């Protein structure tokens, strides 16, 4: 049987309305997809080449209906320290993590340290009912390096599989409909093959990301 949920309304004496965090997250998750928002600097990760550090710009994101905001408290941007990588390159990941179990109930920027290797891979993202991570950037820590260069940072915010943008869920459908409407169908029953379908999916993701960036 279908179940309706709605909110939010003030209580009155004869009709008390109470809501908890899970109900608020339920509504927000239905409206907004996971990812960074256009708030402030969008949680962009950068490096200045002056040490084994990266910086995270002010901004915000939405993860599974929960909201995270990094703002200026007067002490400067958030700085992360990366460990030296020794004799082989390593790829770290800067993520925003939601910890939703009852003992934690917290969100924050976290540094995932990779494993040095001749062919290094970024740490896997944890995504389950209790912990959900979105990746802001990959950071390559080069062997024996004493600094992270600007070019060692790979922005992952625009990759929907890693992070994405906190745009309305209807936006992807609207973009897809726009693309379908713009296609000129010359044969009845025209169908996309696997390659064309993959290209179309990529274009939809690209346009969604561009729409989110233009809203900043």
Q: Where are the regions a protein language model picked out?
A:
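N-terminal alpha-helical "arm" segments
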Residues: 1-43
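Extended, low-complexity, intrinsically disordered tandem-repeat tracts enriched
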Residues: 45-47
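Short, solvent-exposed loop/edge segments of extracellular or virion-exposed proteins
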Residues: 177-187
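Short interaction-hotspot residues at assembly and binding interfaces
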Residues: 186-196
């Amino acid at each position: 049987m279908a179940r309706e949920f709605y909110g939010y309304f003030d209580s009155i004496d004869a009709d008390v309305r109470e809501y908890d965090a899970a109900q608020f997250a339920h509504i927000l998750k239905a409206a907004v997809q996971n990812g960074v928002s256009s708030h402030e600097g969008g949680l962009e990760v950068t490096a200045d080449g002056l040490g084994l550090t990266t910086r995270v710009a002010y901004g915000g994101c939405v993860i599974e209906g929960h909201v995270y905001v990094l703002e200026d408290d007067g002490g400067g941007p958030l700085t992360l320290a990366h460990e030296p990588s020794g004799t082989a390159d390593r790829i770290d990941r800067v993520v925003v993590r939601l910890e939703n179990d009852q003992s934690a109930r917290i969100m924050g920027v976290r540094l995932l340290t990779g494993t040095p290797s001749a062919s290094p891979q970024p740490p896997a993202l944890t995504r389950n009912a209790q912990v959900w991570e979105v990746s802001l950037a990959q950071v390559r820590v080069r062997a024996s390096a004493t600094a992270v260069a600007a070019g060692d940072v790979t922005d992952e915010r625009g990759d929907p599989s890693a992070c994405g943008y906190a745009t309305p869920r209807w936006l992807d459908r609207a973009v897809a409909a726009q693309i379908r409407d713009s296609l000129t169908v010359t044969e009845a029953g025209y169908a996309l093959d696997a390659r064309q379908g993959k290209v179309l999916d990529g274009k939809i993701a690209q346009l969604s990301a561009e729409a989110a960036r233009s809203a900043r």
